[in-house]
Amino acid sequence: MQKLAEAIAAAVQAGQDKDWGKMGTSIVGIVENGISVLGKIFGF
């Protein structure tokens, strides 16, 4: 869950800095970590 929060924070910071490349990779990290969290919850 901590990695998900870190990915969200990185995406927000990248948006504020207008670093679109980093923002894109941060969004991928959010999706990746979100799927991992859901997998743990539902036992995938």
Curated annotation (Swiss-Prot):
Keywords: Antibiotic, Antimicrobial, Cytolysis, Hemolysis, Secreted, Toxin, Virulence
GO terms under cellular component: extracellular region
Listed GO MF terms: toxin activity
Chief localization: secreted
One of the GO BP terms on file: defense response to bacterium
Keyword Iron: no
Cell compartments where the protein resides: Secreted
Superkingdom of the organism of origin: Bacteria
Tagged with keyword Phosphoprotein: no
Residue ranges of coiled coil: none
Family, per entry: Belongs to the staphylococcal hemolytic protein family.
Function: Has hemolytic activity and also inhibits the growth of gonococci.
Entry protein name: Antibacterial protein 1 homolog
Organism: Staphylococcus haemolyticus (strain JCSC1435)
UniProt lineage: Bacteria, Bacillati, Bacillota, Bacilli, Bacillales
